[in-house]
Amino acid sequence: MALQQEIIQALGVKPSIDANAEIRRSIDFLKSYLKTNSFLKTLVLGISGGQDSTLAGKLCQQAISELRQETGDESLQFIAVRLPYGVQADEQDCQDAIAFIHPDRVLTVNIKGSVLASEQALREAGLELSDFVRGNEKARERMKAQYSIAGMTKGVVVGTDHAAEAVTGFFTKYGDGGTDINPLFRLNKRQGKQLLAALGCPEHLYLKAPTADLEDDRPSLPDEAALGVTYENIDDYLEGKTLDDTIARTIEGWYLKTEHKRRPPITVFDDFWKR
């Protein structure tokens, strides 16, 4: 099997979708998980104001609202978590996303103090963090906060990982990649936009340039600049289209060297890392 087809199969991407059917699929998936694990009462998700968390948040709130109505269990909640590092540059987008999602509960945890404390502790141990590694600290601190909230509310942490991120490994290991359940898995970036359009989301929340915004030295660095390919390229690749060889090799290069991010910790029985 050609590597492109192997990747498409592994990530479950369809060449085209019915947006409303995929919305229903994700909502039912979340509801089914909570019904099967009835001791769980909350879905917890960090909201940044970007496309992915806005979509996942809306799906979570709809799943919880439906399940609450169906079961009469008023303890079921969706908790949206604001996780700024100091002052968020696109604060208004985050507020707009919250207004669109209309979550049951909103918590704000400013991670700056925790990140700086960790950095200082490492400095005292003789390690000075690079800006890139500090960026990963931010992502992991955000996930740590979400798991603390989930632990105190009988919750599960929801992820925003989708196929266009997964294929490039464009997430922090045990940061935004360390979640319990991922309702967007199988969708590429343009398909996520289709779902948001069908849900009536304000366009500026999904037409803005995606950015992880983790590095202080390169604030709001667009994902596409970091990756060296566009999301249009990645989406075309995941839909099975033929791309320029250089672009295809770039995407496949990211996929191969980030394989460890998509797997559990490596054991003596694994050999994927040898290829």
From Swiss-Prot:
The positions annotated for binding deamido-NAD(+) are 140, 173, 180, 260-261
* Superkingdom per UniProt: Bacteria
A GO term, aspect molecular function:
NAD+ synthase (glutamine-hydrolyzing) activity
Gene assigned in the entry:
nadE
Which PANTHER family does the UniProt entry name for this protein? NH 3 /GLUTAMINE-DEPENDENT NAD + SYNTHETASE, NH(3)-DEPENDENT NAD(+) SYNTHETASE
One of its Pfam families is NAD_synthase
Checking NCBIfam families in the record gives: nadE, PRK00768.1
Alphabetically sorted, this entry's keywords are:
ATP-binding, Ligase, Magnesium, Metal-binding, NAD, Nucleotide-binding
InterPro entries xref list? NAD/GMP_synthase (IPR022310), NAD_synthase (IPR003694), NH(3)-dep_NAD(+)_synth (IPR022926), Rossmann-like_a/b/a_fold (IPR014729)
Subunit organization: Homodimer.
Q: Which positions in this protein are listed as binding ATP?
A: 46-53, 160, 189, 211
Which EC number(s) are documented for this chain? Answer: 6.3.1.5
Record's GO cellular component, any one? Answer: cytoplasm
Which reaction equations make up its catalytic activity?
deamido-NAD(+) + NH4(+) + ATP = AMP + diphosphate + NAD(+) + H(+)
What are the GO BP annotations of this UniProt entry? NAD biosynthetic process
Is Transmembrane included in the keywords of this UniProt record? no
What's the protein here called? Answer: NH(3)-dependent NAD(+) synthetase
What's the family?
Belongs to the NAD synthetase family.
Signal peptide as annotated in the record: none
Q: Where does Mg(2+) bind?
A: 52, 165
- The record's top EC class is ligase
Involved pathway(s): Cofactor biosynthesis; NAD(+) biosynthesis; NAD(+) from deamido-NAD(+) (ammonia route): step 1/1
Task: State the function annotated in the UniProt record.
Answer: Catalyzes the ATP-dependent amidation of deamido-NAD to form NAD. Uses ammonia as a nitrogen source.
